Amino acid sequence: MEPAGLTDAQAPRPDFSPSRPMRKRGVERYNILLDATERLLADSSDEDISLAQIADAAEVPLASVYHFFPNRNAAFVALALRFNEEIYQTSITPLTDPEPQTWQELLHMIHARAAAFQNGRPAALRLFLGAGVSVAVRNADLSGNARIARSRERFFEAYFHIPFIPDFVERLEVAGASMDGIWALSYGRHGHVTEHYRQEATAGAIDYLRRFLPEFLPRKPLTQKALERIFIPIEHMAANPFAR
């Protein structure tokens, strides 16, 4: 799978460290640099990558890299944010063939799809699950997880009649964090998320959510309106991640 490019509207905001590309040509150059960074990270640890190497891999002058990224960590954060968007879009893609009939099955299907995505993108595995994750990259990862948790609640509501559960978004975020921890263990031992550890992580998330969810949730007819509601613009996350 080739990396999806960011549009100008999707480019990271200044508070995420990298300079925001403002024009079409700048956006194109920005995505070229992120593509190069991803290729390098797929084969090398972040400590072994320099801005000069990114420039060489992208076949652009080093000054062009400095225009967007003051240091290599800024490039890694920008790449993490791009991965966040791709992972988010994957996470909200409807499950229609077949549709899940239980909430436990829904989680298995969503998690299997997420694991397949990350296993297909070695740089994403290294950035999010590697031992040397920087604080800035980790914060970017957490911001992405918060957005996924908000949409995950709406995903549940699209497929099932669900009772009111206080702080359900936060419960979903905790379940996701526990899954990430087991995936990181798998990555550390095997270099990818194995199916065994994927199932273990999903089982852990299900056991945790059983503290709050009934074992059985009645299905509801899937509607286009409910599916459209799942998407949350990233701009809505800035002030209050748990706002509905």
Residue ranges and their predicted role:
Residues 104-106, 119-150:
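Short secondary-structure transition hinges
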Residues 40, 44-74:
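Helix-turn-helix
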Residues 78, 92-119:
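Hydrophobic alpha-helical connector segments
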Residues 1-44, 53:
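Basic, helix-initiating cap at the start of DNA-binding domains
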Residues 138, 158-205, 212-226:
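Hydrophobic/aromatic-rich alpha-helical bundle segments in the mid-to-C-terminal region
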Residues 41, 76-83, 90, 144, ...:
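Alpha-helical DNA-contacting segments of helix-turn-helix folds
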Residues 215-244:
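C-terminal effector-binding regulatory domain of bacterial HTH transcription factors
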Residues 33-41, 65, 83, 87, ...:
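Short hydrophobic clusters on alpha-helical segments that form packing/core surfaces
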